[in-house]
Amino acid sequence: MRLELAGATVDFPAQGVRALAGVDLVVEEGEQVALLGPSGSGKTTLLRLLLGAVRPSSGRVRVAGLDPFGTPQELHRLRRASGVVWQRDDLVPGLSARINAVMATAPTWGPRDWLMVLTGGVPARYAERLRALSRCHGVDACLPTRVERLSGGQRRRIALIRALLPGPGLLLADEPTTGLDPPAAVAAVEALRCADAATLILSTHDLGVARRFPRIVALRKGRVSFDGPGLCQQDVERIYGVAGVAS
C-alpha cells in the first residue's frame, strides 16, 4: 500500500501542542521504513493519522489512494487492510491468547467461524498460520492461557501475531520491541520485515532497531529531520538535539 502525506499538520489545541508540523512523506508499496525519534517527536501521532484515528488540522493524507477522513467505506477498507501493533497492547482480558490472536480476522468470519472461536477454536483457514507464527515466536504453549496470566513479553508477542495473522497490506508498529529481551526484539523486528509484501512503518527510539531498515525517517518536534538509508553521528545529534549521543 502506498502512503502519502502532504503538509500534514496535527494540532491538539486543548493541550497547546502541535504534534506534527507540515510533514511531507511518501512511502511506496512494499517499502519498509523505520520511524525514528525521541519521545514526543510525533511518531505515534503519525501512525494514528495514517489509520484515520486522529484528524489533520491541515494537509493531505492518502493510503493506497484512500482518504482516511473521507467516507466511512474508505476508512473501513483501510482498517481491514491494516495490521497494527501498539506500544501498549490492547489484548482483551478474560480471553485466551489464542482468541486474542485471531480477533484481527473477525471481519472475515461467517457463522461457523464465530461458533468455532466461541468454543475455543480457530477458523480453519487461519489455523496453520497461527501455529506457525506462535511457534516462531515461542508462544505456542501459551495459546490456551488467558492473557492476563502472561508475562509482558508474551503479551507483546501475541499482539504481534494478531497483527500478522490476516496478512495485511499495511503494517504499523509503534515501539513493538518494548518489554522484549534483545533476542526476542530482533525476532519481532525480523518477523515484521518478512511479512508478505506488506508496506511497513515501525516507530522506535532505538538506533539499533532503526538500522535494520533500508530507510530511516526521523522526526524531531513534529517535523521530518532526516530521511535516508543510514545515519551518521551528526544526523543522530540533530535528531536528538544533543551532542555526543552514541550512534
Give, region by region, the residue ranges found by the protein language model:
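Hydrophobic anchor residue at the start of the ABC signature
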Residues: 160
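Conserved ABC transporter NBD signature motif
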Residues: 59-70, 78
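Helix-to-loop junction immediately C-terminal to a conserved catalytic motif
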Residues: 51
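The feature captures the beta-strand-to-loop junction immediately N-terminal to the Walker
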Residues: 36-38
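Catalytic Walker B motif of ABC-type/P-loop ATPase nucleotide-binding domains
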Residues: 171-174
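Conserved beta-strand-loop-alpha-helix hinge in the C-terminal portion
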Residues: 223-246
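Conserved ABC ATPase signature
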Residues: 146-150, 154
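ABC ATPase C-loop
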Residues: 163-164
